[in-house]
């Protein structure tokens, strides 16, 4: 057999973005090559041993809805599961899991090795093959050339990466891995706009040296135990473990302050900007100087190791300060550090240089995903990787590209934010970033995206069957509740008060009763008639169906109102702008606005409206110019005042 060197799609990098990109492309039937500097680190969790959280869990569910691997791998590796914001509304509830690092890597690698159309090869990439304005392949560190019609680059923190511990630093992609210096230099040659960012990680602690008896235990949810994937189950979960909570104190803070003169962040050695929402412990005591204490979570790294991850003390301070600050906390007085914490600086490329498909604007066929685009977090990377893999595959199939809108998915919100606003610091997803979050819930990710995933070719038969069964069950139950009526004649007042909180004065459909804020699906199903017969139950047994039915009915008014709002803005939001248009010709626009529009070349009117400094008045002027300019898409538009609104 001849060794293959020609593929439809090449994916460079085997982290969370790269693995999802490669799997998505291969699921869609394209011959795909995944190049990684080390096959042993495919799917490695480089920082915290957890998946999900507010906003992040929503992204994982969306990746899962389209056939991705992160959620199901977490179900197979998760050693603690919790629903965050469980007492709040469904829009902001989020799943979070602690994962066994080894089991997670095994789950990801197993899927990669067993995925048809996917080849793995262990080699770092030093160069890209570019002809004119199109990428045609990649060159490895030993000069092996691979050719493809699309290349997805997911380099993580490896591009010219530099690790800092105190005032000492060295080149690395992460601890124990070499940096991608040649590839970084090559990308700079291609004139892609770039900058430097920074992230960090805490020291790891030997659990045998921790006194858990003086700490607060934090168990996972037990009733019910959450599941991440629509294809997952509680039976998949390995043994469950608790986390533990301790706190910093004044002594801790004094020790940190005493080391700031040797901090690479506070002495100007590090130039890259760090993540605002995952600050180092140095940043915390500086930014929140009035706070006496910070909560620290001791998270187990896995079932077969004593290593613990102290979430909340990411640091690049010198090792002697790291040791002292760890040992200043309750329960950690005799702690042994297994690995020092560090900060890492790396190159990223301005995501405003990308199309909404994550293809670069200047080089056809070259896609970027993950931290190279200025994001932070496994979940953000995985979602981008999946999208880039899908669009790389679609391009090689000569099919139309696909990107979800802001009202369709958190993935759509993230990509739109990145390509219109760019980043000044590592971008993290939150539910607050989404205007339509009531419609973008974890529980309906499959209802929003699985059908389109099936049409694209990245959702398999088994998952499609599960989805169809759920969708049909939800529709049947909604119809039953809307067509089943209860009257005062067959419902005793005492029973009505027990289930509904008060008697009923007329006939009601079960759907109307379930809309009441104090009535749950479970209690409604227990409703009995005067003769003891079931008036509502037994209902459906599947938790996912019950949850979907209850949310759809209880929030119907809000969801319908949001849908109408989306419809109102949809036309202008998705109105395609001519890519050859010269914005410098638009009279009335400020020079700054014209410059920004020329630089970013927005694909739609919605994207243009979200570019920093582009006002509603500027959008109205632009529309007037386009209507007068003979662009047929704009000729029949209503008055511009409606667009500005």
UniProtKB/Swiss-Prot annotation:
SUPFAM superfamilies: FAD/NAD(P)-binding domain (SSF51905)
Keywords assigned by UniProt, alphabetized: Cytoplasm, FAD, Flavoprotein, NAD, tRNA processing
GO cellular component, one term: cytosol
S-S pairs: none
A GO MF label: flavin adenine dinucleotide binding
Cofactors required: FAD
Annotated binding of FAD, by residue: 13-18
Record has tRNA processing as a keyword: yes
Function: NAD-binding protein involved in the addition of a carboxymethylaminomethyl (cmnm) group at the wobble position (U34) of certain tRNAs, forming tRNA-cmnm(5)s(2)U34.
Similarity field: Belongs to the MnmG family.
Self-association and partners: Homodimer. Heterotetramer of two MnmE and two MnmG subunits.
Protein name per Swiss-Prot or TrEMBL: tRNA uridine 5-carboxymethylaminomethyl modification enzyme MnmG
């Amino acid at each position: 057999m001849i060794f293959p060197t020609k593929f439809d799609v090449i994916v460079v990098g085997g982290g969370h973005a790269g693995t999802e990109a490669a799997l998505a492309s291969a699921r869609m039937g394209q011959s795909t090559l995944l190049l990684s500097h080390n096959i042993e680190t495919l799917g490695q969790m480089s920082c915290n041993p957890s998946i999900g959280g507010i906003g992040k869990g929503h992204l994982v569910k969306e990746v899962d809805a389209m056939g991705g691997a992160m959620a199901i791998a977490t179900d197979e590796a998760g050693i603690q599961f919790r629903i965050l914001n469980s007492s709040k509304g469904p829009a902001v509830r989020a799943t979070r899991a602690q994962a066994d690092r080894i089991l997670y890597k095994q789950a990801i690698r197993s899927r990669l090795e067993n995925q048809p159309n996917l080849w793995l090869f262990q080699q770092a990439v030093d160069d890209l093959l570019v002809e004119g304005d199109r990428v045609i392949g990649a060159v490895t560190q030993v000069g092996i050339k691979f050719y493809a019609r699309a290349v997805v680059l997911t380099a993580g923190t490896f591009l010219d990466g530099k690790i800092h511990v105190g005032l000492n630093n060295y080149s690395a992609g992460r601890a124990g891995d070499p940096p991608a210096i040649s590839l970084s230099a090559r990308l700079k040659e291609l004139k892609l706009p770039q900058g430097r960012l920074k992230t960090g990680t805490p020291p790891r602690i030997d659990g045998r040296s921790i006194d858990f008896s003086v700490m607060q235990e934090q168990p996972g949810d037990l009733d019910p135990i959450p599941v991440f994937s629509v294809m997952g189950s509680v039976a998949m979960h390995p043994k469950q473990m608790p986390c533990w909570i301790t706190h910093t104190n004044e002594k801790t803070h004094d020790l940190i302050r005493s080391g700031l003169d040797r901090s690479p962040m506070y002495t100007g050695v590090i130039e890259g900007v760090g993540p605002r929402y995952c600050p180092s412990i140095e940043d915390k005591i500086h930014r929140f100087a009035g706070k006496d204490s910070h909560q620290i979570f001791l998270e187990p790294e896995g079932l077969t190791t004593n290593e613990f991850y102290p979430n909340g003390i990411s640091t690049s301070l010198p090792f002697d300060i790291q040791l002292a600050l760890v040992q200043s906390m309750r329960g950690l007085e005799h702690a042994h550090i297994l690995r020092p914490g560090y900060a890492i600086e790396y190159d990223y490329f301005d995501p405003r240089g990308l199309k909404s498909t994550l293809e670069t604007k200047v080089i056809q066929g070259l896609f970027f995903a993950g931290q190279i685009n200025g994001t932070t977090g496994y979940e953000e990377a995985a979602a981008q990787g999946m999208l880039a893999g899908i669009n790389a595959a679609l391009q090689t199939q000569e099919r139309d590209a696909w990107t979800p809108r802001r009202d369709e998915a958190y993935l759509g919100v993230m990509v739109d934010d990145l390509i219109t606003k760019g980043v000044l610091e590592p971008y993290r997803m939150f539910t607050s970033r989404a205007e339509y979050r009531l419609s973008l819930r974890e529980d309906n990710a499959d209802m929003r995206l699985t059908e389109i995933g099936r049409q694209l070719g990245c959702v398999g038969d088994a998952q499609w069957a599960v989805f169809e069964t759920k969708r049909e069950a939800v529709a049947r139950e909604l119809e039953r509740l809307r067509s089943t009526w209860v009257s005062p004649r067959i419902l005793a007042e005492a029973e009505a008060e027990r289930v509904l909180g008060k008697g009923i004065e007329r006939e009601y459909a079960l759907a109307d009763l379930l809309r009441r804020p104090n009535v749950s699906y479970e209690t409604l199903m227990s409703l009995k008639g005067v003769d003891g017969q079931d008036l509502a139950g037994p209902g459906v047994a599947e938790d996912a169906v019950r949850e979907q039915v209850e949310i759809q009915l209880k929030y119907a008014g809000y969801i319908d109102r949001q849908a109408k709002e989306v419809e109102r803005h949809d036309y202008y939001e998705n109105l395609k702008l001519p890519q050859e248009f010269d914005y410098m010709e638009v009279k009335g626009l400020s020079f700054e606005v014209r410059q920004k529009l020329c630089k970013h070349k927005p694909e739609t009117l919605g994207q243009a409206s979200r570019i920093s400094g582009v006002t509603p008045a500027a959008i109205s002027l632009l529309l007037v110019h386009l209507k007068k300019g003979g662009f047929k898409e704009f000729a029949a538009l209503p008055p511009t005042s409606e667009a500005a609104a």
